């Protein structure tokens, strides 16, 4: 990595942490009560009223990763219907399940939504609004994952840094990455990938990166973006949520 870039990123995170010191972190899913989540996703809650004050420990779309007091979001895919795993999610300790279908058991906490995919983005945007943590957003036609790994490695030398796992960089993966941020994290490095116009605006709204990195402007996804100018316009929207931040 270019030494000047490494020094800049380290100094930027350090300055942000200094500015935010004393404000309180409020990021261990604090504020993510079932009541707040229901409001964030504009959903319909059913179940015990007292459970609405429960704070979530985690949010997942994979029934194999359900945690005690977590939220299981039952996404219906082309081959797998998450709704079939709702009973098992409760048995594994989930405090609540979310789905587009009506609840089959109204005695358990349950949130019905119009779209689970949109609900994931809405929850991530809400949770991100509670986070006082410097975020580096990375995009580009190629080299995103390598650049993410390098920047995370540099920051990890001084800060407890969360990074995107694998290529969880789309409108499903980014929210799941945001949900992994915990109280001990001091910085986050988020990879953001797109293939069409409009996607970056939605991703940037979720991630709200303090510092943005574009690796390059190539010829990927021209079937949707038209030409390299289209790629440039689409990727440049990474900073739209925080236009005064470093870019």
Put a short name on every predicted segment.
Residues 2, 22-122, 126:
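N-terminal leader/targeting and accessory segments in enzymes
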Residues 36-39, 119-237, 241:
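Phosphate-binding loop of NTP-binding sites
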Residues 242-247:
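Short "domain-exit" segments at the C-terminal end of structured domains
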């Amino acid at each position: 990595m270019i030494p000047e870039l490494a020094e800049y990123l380290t100094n930027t995170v350090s300055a942000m942490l200094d500015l935010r010191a004393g404000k309180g972190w409020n990021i261990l899913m604090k504020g993510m009560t079932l009541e707040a989540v229901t409001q964030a996703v504009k959903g319909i809650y059913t179940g015990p009223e007292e459970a609405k004050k429960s704070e979530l420990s985690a949010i997942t779309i994979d029934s194999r990763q359900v945690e005690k007091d977590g939220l299981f979001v039952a996404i219906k895919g082309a081959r797998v219907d998450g709704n079939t795993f709702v009973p098992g999610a409760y048995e594994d300790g989930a405090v609540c399940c979310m789905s587009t279908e009506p609840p089959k058991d109204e005695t358990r906490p349950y949130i019905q939504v119009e779209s689970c995919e949109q609900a994931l983005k809405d929850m991530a945007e809400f949770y991100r609004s509670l986070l006082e943590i410097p975020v580096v957003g990375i995009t580009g036609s190629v080299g995103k994952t390598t650049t993410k790994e390098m920047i995370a490695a540099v920051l990890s030398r001084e800060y407890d840094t969360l990074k995107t796992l694998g290529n969880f960089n789309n409108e499903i993966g980014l929210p799941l990455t945001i949900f992994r941020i915990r109280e001990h994290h001091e910085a986050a490095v988020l990879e953001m990938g797109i293939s069409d116009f409009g996607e970056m605006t939605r991703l940037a709204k979720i991630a709200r990166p303090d510092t943005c990195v574009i690796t390059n402007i190539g010829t990927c996804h021209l079937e949707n973006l038209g030409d390299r100018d289209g790629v440039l316009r689409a990727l440049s929207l990474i900073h739209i949520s925080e236009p005064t931040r470093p870019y």
